[in-house]
Amino acid sequence: MLEAKLVIFDLDGTLIDSVPDLAVAVDNMLAHFQLPPAGLDNVRHWVGNGSLKLVERALMHAQQHADNLAAAHAVFLQAYGDTHHAYSRLYPGVPQLLAALAEQDIKLAIATNKPQQFILPILQAFKIEQYFDWIVGGDFLAVRKPDPYHLFYICEKAGMPPTDAIMVGDSKADIDAANAALMDNILLRQGYGQGMDLSGLGAMLVLDDIEALRKHWCLNTHTIE
């Protein structure tokens, strides 16, 4: 049974699988600099710490110095925007989970390291933007996860303490941020754990996927038209 009044979700690896689009953007960025493609499998292991870190990892993989990181990042952002999220997918059960939470008047928010400019368009593409009261991206504030300020900021806007909220994510950054905020948290194995043993990351609870989360919270299944 869910007792929290506010659920803060990570985005990539938690609500959506965006790696196919990210991989296209990374490979297009590398091609711009006449470098070989990284491929989807590599990109899947590199995500979770923001787009700048993703680009840095791609350059390191291509044995390039980070001197042109800013330029490469700009190329990546343009390439990612050009994908129009054509290959990203919601994880199964996400719309039903969000609808069930909204029916119980649970406030919902997103705290992600994804650049702010991409968040609302992708939520709109999947018709789930109406469920979220607050959306905080990786460049919206001066810091990003694992710094807990994203979570403090959302709680302040919601007018409630972190103890009334719960963080749901898929990475060490999510759990470190939640623990630093003294906020309850759940880690999902379905995401981009980067090959880690998720049970050892300090999460209060580790579940397989969105459906397991719905059952854990004893929420009814909703039919979404």
Regions found by a protein language model. Name each.
Residues 2-96, 103-104, 117, 125:
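N-terminal helical cap/lid subdomain that shapes the substrate entry/recognition surface
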